[in-house]
Structures are given as C-alpha cells and as structure tokens.
C-alpha cells in the first residue's frame, strides 16, 4: 500500500570473520507496537530493511537528535504505518569489535551471561531516550492518541522512582524482552 508508510525487515545471519556464522538469526523479537518497542532500545537492525516512498517522506523530516537511523525507521513504521517482518535470514550481519551496538553474543547462554554481567546498566540507554524524545517533539501533532499516551508515559519514567516505574510498566503493558 503506497498510501501509508511501510517498512519490511528481514532477518540476518550473525557472522564473524574469525568464527563464521555465529547465529542463524539476528532478530529474535518482532515488535509492531510501541509497548513492544520502547524497552528494546529499538533493537531491530535496519541494514536489511526496505521501505516505501511514503515512509521516506516521514523519515526525511529532520529531528533534533538521532540515536540511530534504525530507531527512527521503526518508530515511524509503528506510529504512522505498518511494520512487517520476513523471518528468513537474507544477509550476513558482520560482527566485529567496532560495531556501534557492540558484538551480538550469539548463543542463548552467552546472552544470559551478558545480561547478568550488565545487570547494573539502565534498561534504556540515554541515546535512545533522547532519540524518542526528539521523534515525539517533531511528530507530536501527528501521533495518534494511544501512541501519544504510551510515549508520554515512557518519557516521564526517567524522573520517577523505581516503584512508580514498575507500576507504570504494568499499567501501560510495556514488554521487557
């Protein structure tokens, strides 16, 4: 449908020059709502994404801050159009020590170990918080009611206590993957 912004993501093999294929899937979750997305730091890699002209017209509007291009693409798809996923891995996503988002750990055991190792790290990093805030400031007038409430609830959590954050997460049914 060329009338609405659409993005299609494909999966990717995680690949390392030293080890070959680390994992046959880079993406393990497929968010289509803000409630599923906001605590992911928009963890869908956009290297294997395609989008239509209507999406291009949305994302070419400048923001005051960008976390990553992937972040804006997913937010725009969720707020203004459609997000689709092809679950097949269609490319190799190279892992190396200088990746902007860091190396993907590969196995489930390594992912759990990494989560334990980083247990003191905030759930949402500053860059993605500021990117969401800039997106909201730019598109506030166009964002629909429920999505607007979800973003506003998410943004105010930064200043709230742990207990209030936990209540808000339950109240708004945010997913913590």
At which residue positions do the language-model features occur?
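Nucleotide-sugar donor-binding/catalytic module of glycosyltransferases
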Residues: 1-106
């Amino acid at each position: 449908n060329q009338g609405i912004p659409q993005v299609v993501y494909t999966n990717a093999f995680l690949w390392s020059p030293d080890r070959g294929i680390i994992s046959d899937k880079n993406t393990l979750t497929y968010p289509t709502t803000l409630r599923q997305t906001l605590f992911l730091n928009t963890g869908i890699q956009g290297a294997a994404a395609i989008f239509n002209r209507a999406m291009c017209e949305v994302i070419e509007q400048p923001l005051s801050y960008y976390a990553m291009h992937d972040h804006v693409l997913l937010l725009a798809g969720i707020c203004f159009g459609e997000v689709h996923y092809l679950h097949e891995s269609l490319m190799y996503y190279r892992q190396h020590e200088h990746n902007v988002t860091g190396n993907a750990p590969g196995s489930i055991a390594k992912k759990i170990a990494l989560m334990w190792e980083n247990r003191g790290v905030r759930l949402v990093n500053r860059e993605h918080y500021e990117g969401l805030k800039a997106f909201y400031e730019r598109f506030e007038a166009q964002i629909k009611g429920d999505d607007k409430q979800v973003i506003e609830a998410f943004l105010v959590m930064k200043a709230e206590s742990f207990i209030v954050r936990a209540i808000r997460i339950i109240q708004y049914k945010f997913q913590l993957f």
